[in-house]
Amino acid sequence: MSLDITKYPVLAQADTPDELRQLPQGVLPKLADELRSYLLQSVGISSGHFASGLGTVELTVALHYVYNTPFDRLIWDVGHQAYPHKILTGRRDKMPTIRQKGGIHPFPWREESEYDTFSVGHSGTSISAALAMAVAAEKEQAGRKVVAVIGDGAMTGGMVFEAMNHAGDLHNDMLVVLNDNEMSISENVGALNNHLAQLMSGRLYTTIRENSKKVLKGMPVIKEMAKRTEEHLKGMVVPGTMFEELGFNYIGPIDGHDVDALVETLRNMRNLSGPQILHIMTKKGRGYEPAEKDPIGWHAVPKFDPSTFAKPAAKPANPTFSQVFGRWLCDMAQKDDKVLGITPAMREGSGMVEFSQRFPNQYFDAAIAEQHAVTLAAGFACEGYKPVLAIYSTFLQRGYDQLIHDVALQKLPVIFAIDRGGIVGPDGPTHQGAFDLSYMRAIPNMVIMAPSDENECRQMLYTGYCYNEGPTAIRYPRGSATGEPQVETMTAYEIGKGLIKREGKKIAILNFGTTLASASQAAEALDATLADMRFVKPLDVELVKQLATSHDLLVTVEENAIMGGAGSGVLELLQQLKLPMPVLNIGLPDEFIKHGECGEILAELQLDGPGIEAQIRAYLAD
């Protein structure tokens, strides 16, 4: 389904930035209105990230109007806010396909467009990449400009400040636009600040500022007094001292929804030398009342009818694994005030809203700082607490050194509740939980569990709570659980023990995690033995030995990369046991998995029931 572009007469004239730059500046407010309306309608058709893009419409228009993209480099941090950028860079008609199998990518993606100068998906990467591009631009002497756009949420990550510290030291020409949509840094926005920003970015001010530095260079005492006076005067009206200390010239804050003010300020800043930061204030969900009132709820949305001002009612479904985790955490916190819940800024997604409200003194949001979150948990464990870190599989990668150095090395009893393990679907390769079993298996002292349903998930979390000899990881997928009736009684599993779910002949399927239902279909069709292994590490040695000595073929099934995954662990164990035999590893291939619906992807990868059966039959036929 496509949208009727005739309803957007100005937007129709701006399919690319080159066309946009041909428009008179006076029509830019109208263009912004049409762009916002088009975004609203297209996301209603496709689903996707929504509220962030509504807040960056005017900024996107102004950036492409002032800067000569793609020659000038524009890097978006994370990419949730980049839908307007996609619309203005030749992908307007494809927007209804975003995040769908075969459709355009959910984030800026280098393979998709020359305007996407850096592929993104995780937060905090833009300034590092922009700095490198700024250094390269100076080496080339081609007059290329570089801009990074980053949100105030991503500014909580340590990598951002590492990059800014380096940029301030190198002093290459670059602009960082701080899109502040939560009013977490400053509320000083209005006509005075807009005027001040244009004044401070103007040629007269910057010329006087730089010439004064040259004159005062030989008079250190007077120079220091002047510097302090300037900082004091600026500090009275702008919150930029921190950025100035990092070596950036700070401009702002200004209204990020005033496209004319943005254009004029960016024009001035385009010609400034050295690292610059422009602080803009925006409203997440701007222009659509429900999203303005509930920007978190409208951050990412399913398909909806914009005219109803409501998201579609959720279909009755089983609780999600995230909800199962959240309920378990509340149950445990009720019984034990030493239980602490930690999240790196994923409270809603990880199912921790109720916990944060009921147990505020036991809840810690570490912000978008995964390294800090892991070591925070380690510190709590040292003091006798029971820290539970709820973290997405793809984001735990960012705290890998801390997992090894600060947790596992010290055998600290931290519980890792790893959400979004396996295929996550529409968010694509930056968010698929494809590698956690592989990268955790290599770490000594780790206990790794993979539940097949919500009850096993609950019992495994409790097993982690009871285990004090080191860290435990419980890895579960995105989306609804299987619908098993909840078993209220919690019992810790014996570490490293699985169980046989079905007795068969010749073939034994060793399943790890929520692929159990699909593996069961294949086992029924093939009259195979089926084992629910439960533990990826340590493996159930006796069960593997028993299955290997009584079957002709072992098949491992997991929703993780085959390389280094649970199946690799089975092969390593068989080698140690000196039990050579045919083994078929079924899992994710050695490639980054593209976006699409989870069911579509699993079927394409032959990880559904028929696919597992087909892979086994093909192996036997060779």
Curated annotation (Swiss-Prot):
Role description: Catalyzes the acyloin condensation reaction between C atoms 2 and 3 of pyruvate and glyceraldehyde 3-phosphate to yield 1-deoxy-D-xylulose-5-phosphate (DXP).
Family affiliation: Belongs to the transketolase family. DXPS subfamily.
Protein's pathway: Metabolic intermediate biosynthesis; 1-deoxy-D-xylulose 5-phosphate biosynthesis; 1-deoxy-D-xylulose 5-phosphate from D-glyceraldehyde 3-phosphate and pyruvate: step 1/1
GO MF term list: 1-deoxy-D-xylulose-5-phosphate synthase activity; magnesium ion binding; thiamine pyrophosphate binding
Top-tier EC class: transferase
Swiss-Prot/TrEMBL cofactor(s): Mg(2+); thiamine diphosphate
Record text on subunit structure and interactions: Homodimer.
Keyword set, alphabetical order: Isoprene biosynthesis, Magnesium, Metal-binding, Thiamine biosynthesis, Thiamine pyrophosphate, Transferase
Cited Pfam families: DXP_synthase_N (PF13292), Transket_pyr (PF02779), Transketolase_C (PF02780)
Catalytic activity: D-glyceraldehyde 3-phosphate + pyruvate + H(+) = 1-deoxy-D-xylulose 5-phosphate + CO2
Residue stretches spanning the membrane: none
GO biological process, one term: isopentenyl diphosphate biosynthetic process, methylerythritol 4-phosphate pathway
Name of this chain's protein: 1-deoxy-D-xylulose-5-phosphate synthase
Cofactor binding summary note: Binds 1 Mg(2+) ion per subunit.
UniProt binding sites for thiamine diphosphate: 80, 121-123, 153-154, 181, 288, 370
SUPFAM superfamilies: Thiamin diphosphate-binding fold (THDP-binding) (SSF52518), TK C-terminal domain-like (SSF52922)
Record-listed E.C. numbers: 2.2.1.7
Binding site for Mg(2+): 152, 181
SMART domains: Transket_pyr (SM00861)
CC terms in the record's Gene Ontology section: cytosol
